[in-house]
């Protein structure tokens, strides 16, 4: 298994960050972006060239989304991912744009936090989130990619049920074990 690290598209120069990945002995990285204005063809081409220069494979594009995000149990379910209805459509569009950016980067994986998935499968909230995720998953599939859920904010049973209910063959997990501990849902 190859080990890598995450490179954020912010702050210090990207060339320095990608060179450090190589100099630290890693062969792969995830590129992470929370600012949709940076998802340009020029940025993708530059990152791809830098990764080729420093022999670093982009394993996944980690796509953030706009709007508020509070990483706790009180406000997290109201602000994170595709769960809050008031941010859902804009974030769906941002994830689709992120998929297009990832395609230009040459990676077959796009990951994000999809939010605190509703536990009650018969609820309207659950059905709406599944429909939104399915819409994004189809776009990602059309780009020849896998759509990876960064997990931890939901129980494993809910995660599996959601993936099965979406029903596309291009879904997976971007496992961050720290989230399992942080959110206490690793039952």
Per-region residue spans from a language model:
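Acidic/histidine-rich catalytic cores of soluble enzymes
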Residues: 28-29, 61, 130-187
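Short, solvent-exposed loop/turn segments at secondary-structure boundaries
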Residues: 40-42, 86, 121-126, 184-187
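A short acidic, helix-capping loop that chelates divalent metal ions and anchors anionic groups
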Residues: 69-71, 81, 116-122, 181-184
């Amino acid at each position: 298994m190859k080990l890598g690290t995450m490179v954020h598209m912010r702050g210090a120069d990207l060339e320095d960050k990608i060179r450090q990945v190589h100099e630290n002995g890693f062969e792969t990285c995830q590129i992470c972006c929370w600012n949709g204005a940076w998802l340009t063809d020029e940025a993708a081409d530059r990152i791809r060239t830098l990764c080729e220069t420093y022999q670093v494979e982009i394993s996944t594009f980690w796509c953030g989304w706009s709007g508020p995000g509070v990483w706790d149990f009180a406000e997290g379910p109201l602000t994170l991912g595709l769960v809050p209805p008031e941010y859902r459509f804009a974030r769906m569009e941002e994830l689709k744009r992120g998929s297009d950016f990832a395609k230009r980067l040459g990676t077959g994986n796009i990951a994000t936090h999809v939010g605190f998935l509703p536990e009650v499968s018969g609820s309207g909230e659950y059905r709406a989130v599944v429909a939104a995720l399915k819409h994004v998953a189809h776009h990602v599939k059309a780009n020849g990619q896998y759509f990876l859920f960064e997990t931890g904010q939901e129980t494993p049973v809910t995660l599996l049920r959601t993936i099965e209910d979406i029903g596309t063959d291009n879904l997976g997990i971007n496992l961050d074990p720290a989230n399992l501990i942080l959110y206490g849902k690793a039952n």
